[in-house]
Regions:
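Short active-site-proximal "capping" loops at secondary-structure junctions
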Residues: 30, 57-61, 199
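Substrate-binding/catalytic cleft of secreted carbohydrate-active enzymes
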Residues: 2-3, 97, 101-134, 142-240
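Aromatic-lined substrate-binding rim segments of carbohydrate-active enzymes
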Residues: 37-108, 179-185, 189-190, 207-209
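Short amphipathic alpha-helical/adjacent loop interface patches that line ligand
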Residues: 139
């Protein structure tokens, strides 16, 4: 069993009780053939990163309703999420996971399975119970794979994201709260965070208790962080 570490978010990030700066780079496991994972992760580490981030595309892992694949036995091993995270840990990297249901990521349908469209006028990314029923079915399978990978259980996963850039899409906070609760009920006990564009109306659309806010931007960092500071309750500023 791996040594147990602790990770906390207070006025800054703390790893094993010591201040810790997350330097993260994104590398999505399903976009790189598994035989190249180690090489690419080592290159990420050589850049100075101590953490790798990846989204989890729902449509990759449940291409048909009720048919799940996390084994890596299909698609040339690209579905082996657990193997990827464990490899990152072996190479000395921490991990941040963004486990759907919507990922954006310039990925087909934002990661949603196409079969969702067969369910009439169901409203995606809302608290529509028809939609949430499908998310719940997916999470009941997904979360048991993710829970053992958390830092609290000897794994490398520091944090997990809820939804993605939701404040630019809607303001259904009940939806975000339900996703948060589903993850907690699925055994996720690491900090949960949100990632949104740095604007007041966007943060106000999506702010939910117990979710750490981060900003998503590519330039004008000071302006972005000044806005984020209004909503992160004195916590660390993070571009995620």
């Amino acid at each position: 069993m791996e040594q147990l570490h602790t990770f906390e978010i207070k006025d800054q990030f703390y790893l094993d009780g010591n201040p810790f700066r997350i330097i993260s780079g994104g590398m999505h496991y399903f976009r790189v053939l598994p035989e190249y994972w180690e090489d690419r992760l080592l290159k990420l580490k050589a850049l100075g990163c101590n953490t790798v981030e990846t989204v989890v595309p729902w449509n990759l892992h449940e291409p048909k309703k009720g048919e799940f694949d996390f084994t890596g036995e299909k698609l040339h091993g690209l579905t082996d999420l657990v193997g990827y995270v464990k490899l990152a840990q072996k190479l000395g990297l921490w991990v941040i996971l963004r486990p759907s249901p919507y990922i954006c990521a310039e990925w087909e349908f934002g990661g949603f399975p196409a079969w969702l469209l067969a369910d009439g006028d169901m409203a995606l990314r809302t608290s529509d119970e028809r939609y949430l029923r499908h998310v719940r079915d997916y999470y009941k399978v997904l979360m048991p794979y993710l829970a053992p990978l958390q830092i609290t259980q000897g794994g490398p996963v520091l944090m997990m994201q809820v939804e993605n850039e939701y404040g630019t899409f809607g303001n259904d906070k009940k939806y975000i709260q339900v996703l948060r609760d589903m993850m907690r009920e699925g055994g996720i006990d690491v900090p949960l965070f949100q990632s949104d564009g740095p604007a007041d109306d966007i943060f106000q659309n999506t702010a939910v208790e117990d979710l750490f806010p981060t900003a998503n931007f590519g330039s004008r960092g000071k302006i972005a962080f000044d806005c984020l500071k209004k909503y992160n309750h004195g916590g660390p500023c993070m571009c995620a």
